[in-house]
Amino acid sequence: NKYLTKYSRLMNIMLRDADKASRSIEQEIEYVTLYLELEKMRFEDKLEYEIQLQPDIDTRKEIPNMLLQTWVENALKHGLRHKDGVGKITIIIKNSTGYTEISVEDNGIGREKAKELGTTGTGQGLKILAEQIEIYNHFNKSKIEIRTLDLSDENRKATGTRFIIFIPDNYNFTSLEN
């Protein structure tokens, strides 16, 4: 069964990396791709995703562990679950001067509508991620920054959410592993 094979691989990666502060972009993409493939099976034809990796990205660069999966899970749970039509998640990883920029965008119902509908969840995933980054930043001169944007059309109707993280080129996770 394809589902069980993918699920088993996902769990193996999660357990292997559970105690790590960071992992490579390549490893994070592998993990989130497995996660999204499993969710596609669940959502059937109502979920699409795209991962855009700028050609000059060094996929060995370290990023916070579970970063992409946390944002993708949040987008699925709050943004896309109640959306009519096909939901889409777009992940873009690119270099900017002095940092790597990673964005996760959904075309969901938006954060305000999700609050109105009372979508289930504790908000713990994003809270834990923010706390982890605060700890990482304590050990680095250059800081990781996170931004959340509410997307809308020309009529100010919500069209999704975009999470963006800026990771400085000289960021060091090594001191956190010891």
Model-derived regions: residue spans:
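Two-component histidine kinase transmitter core
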Residues: P168-F173
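Two-component histidine phosphotransfer core
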Residues: N1-L149, N155-K157
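Hydrophobic core positions in the C-terminal catalytic ATP-binding module
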Residues: I89, A158-I167
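Short, charged, solvent-exposed linker or helix-capping segments at domain edges/interfaces
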Residues: T174-N178
